[in-house]
Amino acid sequence: MPSVMIRRNDEGQLTFYIAKKDQEEIVVSLEHDSPELWGGEVTLGDGSTYFIEPIPQPKLPITVRAKRAGEA
């Protein structure tokens, strides 16, 4: 379960950075994106999916733990 940093780039898109892999991808979908609930399943530009435990919408950038979707 890697730690990832999520932030907005200069174009206003969410980016998902995995330091362990030195990989940064654009977030193409986020399951929950409201002030009350933010997170859930995250789909990246390369097609991979991760899961972030839903929380109230945070200020960005934020570092969170994410797991590959489908992992137990």
Curated annotation (Swiss-Prot):
Keywords: Nitrogen fixation. It comes from the Bacteria. Gene3D superfamilies: NifT/FixU-like (2.40.50.240). The keyword Membrane does not apply. GO terms for biological process: nitrogen fixation. The keyword Mitochondrion does not apply. This is Protein NifT.
